[in-house]
Amino acid sequence: IERSCPDWERLAQDGFVLLDPTGPGFDAAWSGAETILLSDIGDPLIAGRLTGAGVGPDQRLVFLQHGVTMRDMWRWFNGARLDVVVCATAAEQAGLTADHTSYTLTDREVWRTGFPRHDHLHSLLGRERDSILLAPTWDPEVSRALESDPDAVGLLSALYRPWLELAAGLTQASYRTVLFAHPKLVLHAPEWFRALGVPAVTGRELPETLARSWAVVSDRSSVLDEGMIAGCVGIVWDPRARPDTDRYRARHEAIGAIGADTSAQVHQAVEDVVAGRVTAPEDLLLLDAGACARLTALLRRDVI
């Protein structure tokens, strides 16, 4: 997390010992750990430790993902030391371990316990649904540009324009529409997001929003998967029609999501969902609030 963000201070007040990867004591903590849990294996301060001798043979490295992986990420995963990958759904596990995939992972290394944060999400289920959540995936190039030049907000305008147009159309049709704004982008341009005129949520408000949403519309974001396990209908729509979205769309259609090629098709899908003609697949719905307990039990074992 960003050292300057409120969560750093909050975690310190909660009793956690926090170490900056660039500060004193981190190397000793890393090398002395029996188990290392990571939520981001791409962090430039950490990524170099995941190859070569960065992790000892007697250590266990666990990738506690921050989102469901339904995109083809094998080039990234296969190049890093990953002893365990935590996942949330049967489709996700199959995509990581099946013989026809390019991943080197097997069912032995992939633990389908669910994510601990899903325990809170489960407690919110059953609320009245009244919203449509739009969740465009973040763009790392735009994020890097904003980080080096805060005035590069024109890139945000281009990225979000089709989504804001969709939001305007849905709002005009009397659907309450909410935009998911990726925290990394909001961090660099908070004023831009506040001035949108469309309700926007980031990570902290996301569980409540998902529990109240009929559907989640996304191009390639894992927020779509979060929504589907929370009982939302998934709608895959990529206004930029990128080729790698096809695989993402196909995998989600196979588990009950709706594919849309145009904004008009998104409107029709939303109408069908709100009218009850299309419902979320029940086999994806969170069954309990036991993910944290399941993961903790496995971590306490001496072997993978």
Regions found by a protein language model. Name each.
Residues 116-192, 260, 293:
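Conserved catalytic-core segment of nucleotide-activated headgroup transferases in glycan assembly
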Residues 21-26, 183-225, 229:
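Donor nucleotide-activated moiety binding/catalytic core segment of transferases
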Residues 28-29, 78, 208-210, 251:
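Structural alpha-helical scaffold elements that stabilize or flank donor/cofactor-binding regions
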Residues 287-304:
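C-terminal alpha-helical cap of glycosyltransferases
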Residues 1-120:
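Active-site and donor-binding regions of nucleotide-sugar-utilizing enzymes
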Residues 107, 191-194, 222-286:
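Catalytic binding pocket for nucleotide-activated donors in carbohydrate/polymer assembly enzymes
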Residues 48-69, 151-162, 231-243:
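A short, gly/pro- and small-residue-rich
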Residues 32-35, 83, 130, 213-215, ...:
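Conserved acidic residues
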